[in-house]
């Protein structure tokens, strides 16, 4: 009979276990008293242990026919609670087989163990290892986005009464939140680093305790009209990130001599920042303000380099931004895709309503690298416009004006991307080999060299300039000859809209000038607007008026008369033959020779005629 009873209880226990496994959705709500008693030891456990407790729900409970609560087996891999839970289940099963009356006590013990094991408030999981950060972000702290969702969603899932108890218990356990309004938590892996979520007023941060010990703070989803930067909660921070919120203005300034090294206010729809907001932050290395509605960047007035991210601010104005670029040491993050709006009266840029920061930086380089020539003065450099090249990539055109300085040679170095060089009204006699060997001359396509003493343009032969130029101004120089290479190659591709100006140069005119140069000027008259003003130095004529017949005559030579001499000899021979024939006819018919022939002495050959 006893064996039968034990078998019945064993069968009943197996059926209950099978039912619990088949219906895992039946959850057990932990006892608040047990939660308060047992949460403290586990709350201070290693974050990894807290993570495992959160990963598994509490064990479901079933009741037997006598109303006794029997726990279902817990299948878990928790490092902390697995031993206790498994042991309790095994013990309950063993006692049920030996003594049915002991099931209730065993079950109660198992339930207590299960509750205490899983009663810890849902802490944040450990984030994955972050990739190595760039140098400018080495002092920046960013809490992972899932930390906010995990921590505060976990609290929301509990009932109203339990949520209050859990919040108070967690605040006491962490020692950092002495007020229930505090919406901040300490980061699980970074010491002295805190994150706050869903902030609607700064008191949700300032109500936390030990704020003075905080080093890093990341606030997500802050929704306020004005954020006061002078609040003491920011005094001791080295890294402050306020992201993904809705803030209208940043008012006031950070405290004097703030320790802040990294500041990120991205993705907040901010439209205004106090002009002196970061003026007294001497150690600031990174300032991220991307994806807002800002039109101005606050001044720093600091000499230290800073990395700045203004991408995504489509209302940013170019004029004040350009002033900051010139006066402060700033490295822009993603300058190709950071844009600003410029005043339409500017002439730097060509047919666009927005300008990239990269173009503004190029303008600064154009000006700061402008040539300064000892004993002569400084050139004037401007970024006149933007030239669109292949793949829609813009390239700045730096124009260098070194006119009226009295230079005797070209500048040694030009700014990068110099497309126009103006050296008019100087005393330059030679172009030298700059267009061959100096890389800063390779992009020039406009050369203004009027009113100098340049005597030759042979230096252009074989250069990139002769292939890509658009304008050459060489008026009123000392050119004596235009080389044949230049004539054959300078205007081969008229599709580039090339123009050459040579008026005021007095060339050495000769037969070759009349034949080759004159024809070249006539054929390319549309590309040489002042071709009518090119004159000769050795005759008072313009090149276009030269006459080939006059210039191409050869000096007198005896070979020119040989044909006349031959013709005269032929005529003389014919006359002699005619005279001899006539005398012979007279002698035969009249018997005497004409008087001239009778006076001539006899020759040895006369006997031929006397026979």
From Swiss-Prot:
Domain of life: Eukaryota
Extent of Basic residues compositional bias: 43-59
Domain LRRCT as annotated: residue spans: 505-554
Positions bearing carbohydrate: 221, 246, 264, 269
Signal peptide: 1-22
Residues annotated as domain LRRNT: 361-416
InterPro entries assigned to the protein according to its UniProt record, in alphabetical order: Leu-rich_rpt (IPR001611), LRR_dom_sf (IPR032675), SLRP (IPR050333)
Polar residues bias: start-end ranges: 90-101, 159-183
Disruption-associated phenotype: Mutants specifically interrupt the transmission of the regulatory signal from early to late ecdysone inducible genes.
GO BP annotation list: intracellular signal transduction; pupariation; response to ecdysone
Renumbered residue ranges of the record's region Disordered: 31-64, 90-132, 154-185
Repeat found in the keyword field: yes
PANTHER family: AGAP008170-PA (PTHR45712), INSULIN-LIKE GROWTH FACTOR-BINDING PROTEIN COMPLEX ACID LABILE SUBUNIT (PTHR45712:SF22)
Functional description taken from the UniProt entry: Has a role in the ecdysone induced cascade; probably indirect control of 'late' ecdysone genes.
Protein name, UniProt field: Protein halfway
Organism whose genome encodes this protein: Drosophila melanogaster
Lineage: Eukaryota, Metazoa, Ecdysozoa, Arthropoda, Hexapoda
């Amino acid at each position: 009979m006893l064996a039968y009873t034990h078998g019945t209880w064993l069968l009943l226990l197996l059926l209950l276990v099978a039912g619990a496994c088949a219906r895992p959705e039946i959850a057990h709500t932990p006892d608040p008293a047990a939660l308060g008693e047992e949460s403290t030891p586990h709350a201070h456990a290693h974050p990894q242990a807290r993570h495992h407790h959160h990963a598994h729900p509490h064990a479901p409970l079933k009741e037997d026919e006598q109303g006794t609560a029997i726990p279902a087996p817990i299948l878990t891999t928790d490092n902390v609670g697995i031993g206790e839970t498994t042991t309790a289940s095994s013990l309950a099963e063993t006692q049920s087989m030996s003594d049915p009356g002991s099931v209730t006590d065993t079950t109660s013990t198992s339930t207590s163990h299960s509750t205490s094991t899983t009663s810890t408030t849902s802490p944040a999981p450990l984030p994955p290892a972050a990739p190595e950060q760039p140098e400018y972000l080495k002092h920046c702290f960013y809490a992972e986005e899932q930390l906010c969702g995990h921590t505060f969603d976990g609290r929301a899932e509990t009932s109203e009464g339990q949520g209050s108890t859990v919040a108070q218990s967690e605040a006491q356990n962490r020692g950092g939140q002495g007020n229930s309004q505090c919406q901040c938590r300490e980061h699980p892996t970074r010491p002295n680093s805190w994150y706050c979520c869903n902030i609607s007023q700064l008191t949700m941060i300032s109500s936390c305790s030990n704020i003075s010990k905080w080093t890093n703070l990341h606030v997500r989803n802050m929704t306020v009209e004005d954020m006061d930067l002078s609040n003491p909660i920011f005094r001791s921070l080295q890294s402050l990130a306020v992201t993904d919120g809705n803030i209208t203005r940043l008012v006031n300034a950070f405290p004097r001599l703030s320790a802040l090294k990294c500041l990120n206010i991205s993705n907040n729809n901010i439209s205004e920042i106090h002009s002196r907001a970061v003026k007294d932050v001497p150690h600031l290395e990174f300032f991220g303000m991307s994806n807002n509605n800002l039109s101005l960047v606050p001044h720093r007035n600091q000499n230290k380099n800073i990395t700045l991210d203004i991408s995504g601010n489509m209302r940013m104005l170019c004029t004040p931004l350009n002033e900051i670029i010139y006066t402060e040491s700033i490295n822009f993050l993603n300058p190709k895709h950071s844009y600003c709006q410029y005043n339409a009266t500017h002439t730097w840029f060509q047919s666009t309503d927005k300008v990239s920061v990269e173009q503004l930086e190029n303008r600064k380089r154009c000006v700061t690298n402008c040539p300064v020539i000892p004993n002569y003065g400084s050139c004037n450099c401007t970024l006149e416009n933007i030239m669109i090249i292949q793949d829609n990539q813009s390239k700045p055109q730096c124009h260098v004006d070194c006119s009226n300085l009295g230079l005797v040679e070209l500048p040694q170095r030009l700014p990068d991307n110099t497309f126009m060089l103006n050296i008019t009204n100087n005393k330059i006699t030679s172009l030298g080999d700059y267009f061959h060997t100096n890389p800063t001359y390779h992009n020039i396509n406009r050369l203004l060299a009027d009113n100098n003493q340049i005597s030759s343009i042979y230096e252009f032969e074989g250069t990139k300039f002769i292939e890509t130029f658009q304008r050459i101004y060489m008026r009123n120089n000392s050119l004596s000859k235009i080389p044949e290479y230049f004539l054959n190659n300078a205007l081969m591709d008229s599709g580039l809209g090339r123009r050459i100006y040579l008026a005021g140069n007095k060339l050495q005119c000769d037969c070759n000038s009349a034949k080759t140069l004159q024809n070249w000027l006539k054929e390319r008259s549309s590309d040489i607007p002042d071709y009518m003003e090119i004159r000769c130095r050795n005759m008072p004529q313009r090149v276009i008026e030269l006459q080939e017949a006059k210039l191409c005559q050869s000096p007198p030579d005896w070979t020119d008369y040989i044909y006349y001499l031959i013709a005269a000899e032929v005529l003389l021979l014919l006359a002699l033959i005619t005279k001899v024939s006539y005398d012979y006819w007279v002698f035969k018919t009249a018997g005497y020779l004409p008087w001239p022939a009778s006076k001539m002495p006899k020759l040895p050959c006369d006997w031929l005629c006397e026979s």
